[in-house]
């Protein structure tokens, strides 16, 4: 058992909320801060890629008794569905017979996780902007603006779960011997939508991860519980087939007719979706160390943001929590050792997953359409 600590988690995303549940179960006081409004009260932004939960993620949920609860809001996916340019559709089953992953809507999952964290006793503070953290004594500084007046919030321990552009990491970067790199991909993404049939069923096979591989660009689709699909168009920002060349309705419609002909009947709002939803960037970040003394630790994307082509971003963040929990069980109140062993264990794995994710774009966009692959 650990001596109860007053702990702040900065970031109410998936990793921050699951971490809050783990910490509460260990008897700590947990406050979660987020500069955004409560996701349960806001309209969807049109800038999200559906999530894939694999064994790594399920283990972390299983260990705390949440696996079955989360499976209720997911859809089992047991194969890739490959849509070739000539209209041919083929399937590639995952691994062993019966092996599968789960498709989850980020928004639906995040809302549920916040509910579960509140039920566990964590307190959430939304619309609260954290601008800085004192690494020496685990104090947060919040205020309306970066240049305005700040208020100090005192804690025993702070976790930065505030994503690729983490404010907690920003403070750590100013320390000597802190390594940090950031790389924006030349590929962006845009969300599109396949609505449900009138009777609420799915227009295409709901148990497939749908891929339209086209070389240096591709379309992907994953099913939602309401009968719809969230689709994501990944393509270069510039060049022959790129976002910069899809500037008007005619060009867009012609482009989809040429490269994605079988989507014509299933994406009725293509033009509206394409020009309404933002074109978003993909960024990879790496850093080390992830922790400072026994006071502050980074977790999830704040320590290792990766590109989504291996479907492991959330799973890697959840695995961070699994390893952190192992270290808490092993080392009790010795937070310095907990943090040191946590980062030592996770850093090589996070780097490996980042590289696999980058490489998997080539496999998904090109090789899945290769006859030898099929």
Can you annotate each of these PLM segments?
Residues 4-78, 83-85, 97, 101-108, ...:
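Glycine-rich FAD cofactor-binding loop and adjacent beta-loop-alpha segment at the N-terminus
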Residues 35, 163, 302:
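Active-site metal-binding loops of divalent metal-dependent hydrolases
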Residues 88-104, 234-238:
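Helix-loop-beta segment of a Rossmann-like dinucleotide-binding subdomain
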Residues 104-128:
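Helical element adjacent to the flavin cofactor pocket in flavoenzyme catalytic cores
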Residues 115, 119, 128-132, 137-282, ...:
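Conserved FAD-binding catalytic core of PHBH/FMO-like flavoproteins
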Residues 292-307:
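Short FAD-binding loop at a beta-strand-to-alpha-helix junction that anchors the flavin cofactor
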């Amino acid at each position: 058992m650990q001596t109860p600590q007053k702990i702040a988690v900065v970031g109410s995303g998936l990793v921050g909320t699951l971490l809050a549940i783990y910490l509460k179960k260990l008897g700590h006081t947990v406050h979660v801060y987020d500069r955004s409004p409560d996701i349960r009260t806001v309209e969807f932004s049109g800038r999200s890629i559906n999530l894939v939960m694999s064994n790594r993620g399920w283990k972390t949920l299983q260990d705390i008794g949440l696996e079955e609860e989360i499976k209720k809001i997911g859809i089992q996916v047991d194969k890739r569905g490959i849509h070739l340019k000539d209209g041919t559709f083929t399937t590639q089953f995952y691994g062993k017979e019966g092996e599968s992953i789960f498709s989850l809507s980020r928004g639906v999952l995040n809302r549920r996780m916040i509910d579960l964290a509140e039920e566990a006793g964590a307190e959430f503070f939304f619309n609260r902007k954290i601008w800085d953290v004192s690494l020496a004594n685990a104090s947060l500084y919040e205020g309306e603006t970066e240049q305005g007046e700040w208020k100090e919030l005192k804690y025993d321990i702070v976790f930065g779960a505030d994503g690729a552009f983490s404010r907690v990491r920003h403070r750590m970067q100013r320390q000597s011997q802190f390594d940090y790199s950031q790389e924006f991909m030349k590929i962006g993404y845009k969300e599109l939508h396949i609505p449900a049939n009138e009777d609420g069923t799915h227009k295409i096979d709901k148990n497939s991860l749908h891929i339209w591989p086209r070389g240096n660009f591709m379309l992907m689709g994953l099913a939602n519980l309401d009968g719809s699909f969230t689709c994501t168009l990944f393509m270069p920002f510039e060049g022959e087939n790129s976002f910069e060349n899809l500037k008007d309705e005619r060009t867009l419609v012609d482009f989809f007719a040429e490269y994605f002909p079988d989507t014509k009947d299933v994406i009725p709002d293509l033009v509206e979706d394409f020009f309404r939803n933002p074109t978003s960037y993909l960024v990879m970040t790496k850093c080390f160390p992830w922790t400072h003394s026994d006071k502050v630790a980074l977790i999830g994307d704040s320590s290792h943001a990766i590109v989504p082509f291996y479907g492991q971003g959330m799973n890697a963040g959840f695995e961070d929590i699994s390893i952190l929990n192992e270290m808490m069980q092993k080392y009790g109140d010795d937070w310095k050792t907990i943090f040191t062993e946590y980062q030592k264990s996770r850093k090589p794995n996070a780097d490996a997953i980042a590289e696999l994710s980058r490489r998997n774009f080539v496999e998904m966009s090109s090789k899945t359409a290769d006859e030898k692959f099929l």
